[in-house]
Amino acid sequence: MADFAKLYNDPILSKKRIGSVEDPYLTYNETLTIFNGRALLTEIPNREFRVEVTGDNKEWREIEDGELDDNYFKVDYLMGVVFFNASNEGKSLTFNYSGEGASFFPASRIWIKRQGNMVIETLQGLIDEAEDTIIRMNERIAECERVTKRCQEVTAWCRQATSNYEEVVENTRKIYKPSVYTYSDIFTYYPTPQIGWTVTVKETKIVYRWDGFEWVDIGTSEVYEGFNILLSATEPFNANYIWYKDASFSPEKKRVVVSDTAPDSGQVWYKTD
C-alpha cells in the first residue's frame, strides 16, 4: 500500500508561462514518433497559437471532434498530447507550437493498483522494487564474476602444477637399458639417447642417466644380469623370473651376481673376465 505520509509531501512540479514580454512562451520545433496512436509534446501547447504538424508528405489537419482520418489529428491542450489515426503508428513527425510550460507528476502520485478508491500500489513502488531487483542482480553478477575469476585462478594454478609435475617426471623418470661394461660403451650402444635412459656400467657399478644434455652419474648400484631366479616347485605368476623347478625346494628367490671372486653361499655367480 502507498505510504501516504510521503505521498502528500511529494509535490507536483509545474512551470506556467504567461506569454508576456517578461515571461514569453517558448517556441518548439521538435520531431516525435507516434506511439500507441499519440505523441507527447515536451510542453503544454498554447491553444491560441495551435499546433502545426508536418511530415510524411501529407497535409495535416487539426480537428476537435469527429473521427480521426488518416491525415487528421486532435490535440489535448490540457495534457500536451496529440492523437492520430492508427495507420500513422511509428511515424516520425515534426510539431511546431508555443509552449506554456509543463506539469510534472511524481511517480508516487501515479497509481497502478487500487481497491475501490484506495490506492494500494503506485508507480514509485514499482520503480523501487525494480531498483531493488537490479541491485540484487548486480550483486549476483559481481559474485559470479568473483567466482569466475577464482575458477580461472585455480585453473591457471592447476595447469602450472601439472606443468611442474610433468617437468619433474620428465627430469626424474628412469628408463632402464641393458648395462654396458665400460663408460665409453654407453656412447657406442646408445648414440642417440632419450631423456630418462638409465644405464649401469659394470666396470665401476656406476649408474648413468641421460638428462637431455649429458650422461649424469646418479650413484652406484649392485649390477645384476638377466632375471631373478626362483627356486620353487610351482610356477611363479610373475613372468620376470627364471624358474628353476625342483619339488624338493621351498620357494626361494635368488639373484645373479656379477663378481670376479666367488660370492657367499646361496648366490648365483657370474664371473667377469
From Swiss-Prot:
Coiled coil feature spans: 119-149
Superkingdom of the organism of origin: Bacteria
Keyword set includes Coiled coil: yes
Keywords linked to the UniProt accession: Coiled coil
Protein name: SPbeta prophage-derived uncharacterized protein YomF
